[in-house]
């Protein structure tokens, strides 16, 4: 990791995804990188994305270690870490997960009025793979209801979707809750606009097909995790991974994504192909 950083140019971005279970040596390295003498002086945007598990998926000892790692990194650089949650079931204890994350921020002295983002990833299908736990689209409104209630309970919380923001998440919203919608982020950086303006604005919450590519250790390129069965190319196929080569691969991905038609409930949904792309095109291949 340190060698990777040494070879990076200023004003570039490096992100590390971790479950938080690491040795003290690895933690010390991350602390050096997020600190002033690491990525900041080199003008490199470095961040850690920490996957925060539910207690049914992790031991108490390992959960405590994840908290220790998170507090250490946030204590060194408050912008150096973001928590990540998988939305896999309406029965998961999402409230406890958020409470634990909020407790960490409050314990470190998060100023009143300042918000923090929690990255959320719905459990999309993985094309070509059976047995993968998937959040059914029919459960999206109930999941959205859970998230709206949490936004009311934790006023400094914001939810960030790296990719699509399925509008059906808001199917059970009440009019007095409309302002909460703008505390959702989609495509990684855009705040969801006022819900009353959705019909009058050209908004698209669907597949962020122009997002950064996934590149595996062999150099094979994939559009995103749900479509790892569809190799789009290899970085050695191009002299450089520039805008032209990336657009070529995205075009190849979209032609593949539209090979399958939407299933219900998306097929009859008024949002489909207006503001949404079935949450994820991978649902169409089930």
Predicted regions and their residues:
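Short, acidic, Ser/Thr-enriched surface-loop or helix-capping motifs
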Residues: 215-216
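C-terminal accessory region of radical SAM enzymes
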Residues: 141-197, 220-277
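Short, small/polar residue-rich loop motifs at catalytic or cofactor-binding pockets
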Residues: 205-210
């Amino acid at each position: 990791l340190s060698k990777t950083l040494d070879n990076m140019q200023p004003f570039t971005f490096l992100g590390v995804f971790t479950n938080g279970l690491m040795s003290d040596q690895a933690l010390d390295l991350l602390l050096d990188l997020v600190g002033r003498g690491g990525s900041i002086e080199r003008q490199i945007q470095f961040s850690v994305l920490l996957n925060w598990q539910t207690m049914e998926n992790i031991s108490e000892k390992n959960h405590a270690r994840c908290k220790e790692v998170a507090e250490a990194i946030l204590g060194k650089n408050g912008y150096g870490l973001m928590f990540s949650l998988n939305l896999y079931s309406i029965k998961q204890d999402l409230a406890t997960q958020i409470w634990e994350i909020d407790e960490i921020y409050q314990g470190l002295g998060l100023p009143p009025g300042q918000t923090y983002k929690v990255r959320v990833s719905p459990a999309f299908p993985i094309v070509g793979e059976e047995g993968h736990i998937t959040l059914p689209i029919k459960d999206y409104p109930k999941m959205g209801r859970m998230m709206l209630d949490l936004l009311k309970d934790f006023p400094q919380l914001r939810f960030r979707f790296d990719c699509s923001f399925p509008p059906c998440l808001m199917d059970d919203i009440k009019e007095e809750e409309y302002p909460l919608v703008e505390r959702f982020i989609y495509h990684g950086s855009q705040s969801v606009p006022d819900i009353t303006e959705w019909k009058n604005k050209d908004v698209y919450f669907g597949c962020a097909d122009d997002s950064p590519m996934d590149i595996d250790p062999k150099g094979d390129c994939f559009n995103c995790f749900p479509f790892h069965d569809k190799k789009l190319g290899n970085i050695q196929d191009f002299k450089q991974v520039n805008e032209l080569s990336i657009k070529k691969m995205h075009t190849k991905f979209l032609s593949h994504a539209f090979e399958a038609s939407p299933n219900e409930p998306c097929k009859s949904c008024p949002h489909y192909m207006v503001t949404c792309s079935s949450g994820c095109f991978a649902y169409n291949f089930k």
